[in-house]
C-alpha cells in the first residue's frame, strides 16, 4: 500500500461534520485531507512539515484541474490544523478559508472531479460562487474566465454550465451571504442541479 498511515472516512452527513470527524481521527496536530477524486503524484511529499514558528494555519497545496487546465488550491490535498478544524463551527462559504491558511505552490496531483454529471456541475457551481464572492484580483478574474469557458474531457459542458449558473445565481441574489451559503449543503445543490437539468 502506497500510504499505510492513511485513514478513510465515509458515511458522515454534512460537510462540516465530515471535516470534524476527520480531525478527530487524527493522532497529530496536523493531518492531510485528500479527496477520493485526486490522483496523487508519486512525487508529492506527505512528509511536509508546518512552520512551527508561525501561528497555526491550514496549508493548501495545488491540484491540476483536467477540464480547464488551472492549477491552484481548488480540490487539492490540504494539511489541516486539527484544532482549527474542530473550532470551525460556522464556516463561511469555504470551510478551509474560514481559518488562517497558507498556500504552498507545490502540485499534489490531478483532481478528477468530473466523474458524474451532478458532481461536475456542483463542483463548478460552488467554486465559481467562491470566486465571485472574493475581492477581484488578476488571478481570480483569470480563474473565473477559465471556469466559464468550455473545457475538455468528460462532462466539460456541465462544468461550464455549473460555472455559468453560479455567475447568474450570484447576480440574482446580489451576493447575499445567506443565499450563497445555501450552496454549502449538498441537499440544496442536488435540488438546484435537478431544477436545471
What are these regions (language model features)?
Residues 1-27:
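N-terminal anchoring/stem segment of glycosyltransferases
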Residues 12, 37, 64-66:
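Short, solvent-exposed coil/turn elements at secondary-structure transition points
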Residues 18-19, 35, 72-74:
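Residue-level signal for functionally critical sites in structured catalytic/ligand-binding pockets
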Residues 22, 29-42:
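Short beta-strand-to-loop acidic/aromatic patch adjacent to the donor-nucleotide binding site
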Residues 28-29, 75:
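Short, surface-exposed beta-edge/turn micro-motifs
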Residues 47-197:
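Catalytic-site signature of metal-activated, phosphate-bearing donor transferases
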Amino acid at each position: 500500500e502506497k500510504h499505510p498511515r492513511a485513514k478513510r472516512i465515509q458515511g458522515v452527513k454534512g460537510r462540516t461534520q465530515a471535516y470534524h470527524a476527520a480531525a478527530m481521527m487524527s493522532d497529530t496536530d496536523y493531518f492531510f485531507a485528500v479527496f477520493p477524486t485526486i490522483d496523487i503524484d508519486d512525487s508529492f511529499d506527505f512528509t511536509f512539515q508546518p512552520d512551527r514558528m508561525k501561528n497555526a494555519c491550514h496549508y493548501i497545496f495545488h491540484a491540476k484541474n483536467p477540464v480547464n487546465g488551472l492549477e491552484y488550491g481548488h480540490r487539492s490535498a490540504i494539511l489541516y490544523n486539527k484544532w482549527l478544524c474542530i473550532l470551525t463551527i460556522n464556516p463561511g462559504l469555504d470551510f478551509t478559508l474560514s481559518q488562517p491558511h497558507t498556500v504552498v505552490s507545490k502540485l499534489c496531483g490531478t483532481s478528477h472531479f468530473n466523474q458524474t454529471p451532478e458532481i461536475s456541475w456542483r463542483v463548478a457551481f460552488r467554486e465559481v460562487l467562491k470566486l465571485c464572492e472574493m475581492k477581484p484580483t488578476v488571478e481570480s478574474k483569470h480563474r473565473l474566465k477559465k471556469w466559464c469557458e468550455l473545457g475538455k474531457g468528460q462532462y466539460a459542458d456541465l462544468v461550464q454550465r455549473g460555472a455559468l449558473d453560479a455567475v447568474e445565481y450570484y447576480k440574482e441574489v446580489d451576493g447575499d451571504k445567506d443565499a450563497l451559503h445555501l450552496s454549502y449543503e449538498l441537499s440544496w445543490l442536488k435540488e438546484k442541479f435537478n431544477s436545471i437539468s
